[in-house]
């Protein structure tokens, strides 16, 4: 070895160790200056993004200010798309009750708009634990035919991988009825299901549990009425 080997030694010393991972940048909330600009001048989409940022970092005062701003940014009347964007932004701001207020500014007719409106109304009611309003939204979505809800999959959360978690709207309606203190209505809803196999077995097991405390005669009448439908 001689002087000619020194550059190689220096290069090896300077190289990062094998397998060393780069340190990810530290996530920080929106700066105060940027937040104030969005609060005063931002549109609905910018306010919604600010809500998500404030919620991520637990900044409750920012959430409060953003909620107040979202209630004023698009005064009635507004077209359907604006009302829905405003309502979704309030939901992102953890204000489900205010979401319902904004939704009440627009009454959609039959069709896709009504479906979208009802689904967002259900989402807000579910977030607010407003069981009666959640029941109303799903029953209106069913439009008199509970079997429609059997194959209607609604997003109820996210997996650890960030993938959407879904549940049948029929099962969700039964849960809302049960949470509202109406087990007999929950039984009727569950028996409206048409999905066979494991799902049917699970629902029948739940029905059996709900019927157990009831008088046998009342239980039989309820089963007959549900099956007749």
Question: Predicted segment positions?
Answer:
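Bacterial N-terminal signal peptides
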Residues: 2-15
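Alpha-helical solenoid repeat scaffolds
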Residues: 18-229
